[in-house]
């Protein structure tokens, strides 16, 4: 690869099921195709005895290697092992998730050994793949990127995504919210207008769901409110159809395939395909030969059946829509445009429900739902790296918001919000607290994110201690807590005791699900090692193929009476000896590419010498 470094930055939509990469130069955004010519790449990583596969290659062999093929990692990133959604997902995942001090990690067999990887490392592998797709197109090394996350991601999930970027060797210029990125794609693509518009972005992807209401005027994109579910998407619709098919299989055959990971993977793939077909057709057939225990499976699925199986999930997507309107303080009729983003918005029933919610309003489908988020990320990347020269982007300004309130726990585990949800970022907010006991010299500050009164119902982001503070009567010390949220939506908290001036702070980076600088550096070095192992395997495979091909040609020469006559006297034995050595080298499992090439070269020299005119 060319060592010249690209002076711009790329935009990456790191999706639950598929990822997409784009670049913005001058006045054009280009969505970059992978080596198969597809504009989206599966967010899959697979491990085998010999190599690591990422993207299309990983997904294509998932049924053959279910326990070592990782997907849905976006549903693990920044979460605790004991998170109820993690527990629920583990029931349907064919790969193993283990508890590492409260952090979930995936366990796989790779290169003949057991390895565990954090969600950040797996995400980094997908990001590396997207980076390489861009590098192939640009012919230069890429070092900078803007990465998107669901608007409803909490602080832990945002920081973990930023860490994944660092492990992939990327300087993450900005983390931006997916619906905001899609709004940029829509706002620029629909021709910039100075007319003020209220635009609702309905973003339903493979694993996450966001609704954002933006006010767009000229180049200013102001997020008024956001809501969503970081655990709802196409994967869940597939799962509901899968569960139905499992029951039907058991009803027809009296056999239970629940424990067979390969059968489940094949069935899930068929269900995903059926779901896509039903977006345009009224019915489809799922047909799988010898699905389990020699039994074939054949079932007809109508669109009505699929809609019925997912009725609750589909209807549930309207709750965040209502929430966003309420938070933004606007009525349905004040929404000018409703923009569909994410592959799952192709489902006709979802479109119908959303249109009916807005009293039959026409939905906006002018942007590609799979590519819009990467498009917007690329525009932001172009602006931040100085590559965007278009008049459309010269005055582009993004004003995003905090999706969930941030605060601390008070006595009785009551949540005290400091930064309310919907607050524009970046922001700094202060709140004053005091002590609850006489002569108290230590104060704990557990930091939470959420909307519930009881802190246990919110997400613990981390905690820190302010000590020692001067002994005083309860209620006398003045403890000022400052919350700073940066443009990436990442939080830093500082507490100061005003009389002594003593302070303590935390950039939420050491709690569960977070990585220390040392851990990130180790993961970067591991990622480099795995990359070099991948490259060595590819080179070895190529050298092996070339040697095998050349051996076949030489065998043809010495076994063909006419051709063998052209060999110099006494040379045939030497060639046969070299052939034996080359074949022996092929049998050695850990032969390097260099060793294989040397055998090929030695054989070529002998043949060339023997074929020389006498």
Curated annotation (Swiss-Prot):
Signal peptide: none
BP term (GO), one: translation
Compartment(s): Cytoplasm
CDD domains, alphabetized: ASKHA_NBD_HSP70_Ssb
Keyword Hydrolase: yes
Sequence motif Nuclear export signal, residues: 575-583
Top enzyme class: hydrolase
Gene Ontology CC annotation, any one: cytoplasm
Residue positions binding ATP: 16-18, 74, 206-208, 272-279, 343
Keywords, in A-Z order: ATP-binding, Chaperone, Cytoplasm, Hydrolase, Nucleotide-binding, Protein biosynthesis
Quaternary context: Binds to ribosomes. Binds close to the ribosomal tunnel exit via contacts with both ribosomal proteins and rRNA. Directly interacts with nascent polypeptides. This interaction is dependent on the ribosome-associated complex (RAC). Interacts with SSE1. Interacts with FES1.
Region (Substrate binding domain (SBD)): 404-614
Outcome (variant: residue 208 to A): Reduces ATPase activity
Organism this protein belongs to: Chaetomium thermophilum (strain DSM 1495 / CBS 144.50 / IMI 039719) (Thermochaetoides thermophila)
Name of protein: Ribosome-associated molecular chaperone SSB1
Keyword Ion transport: no
Molecular-function annotations in GO: ATP binding; ATP hydrolysis activity; ATP-dependent protein folding chaperone
Residue segments, region Lid domain (SBDalpha): 517-613
Residues covered by region (Nucleotide binding domain (NBD)): 1-392
Gene: SSB1
Domain of life: Eukaryota
Similarity comment text for this entry: Belongs to the heat shock protein 70 family. Ssb-type Hsp70 subfamily.
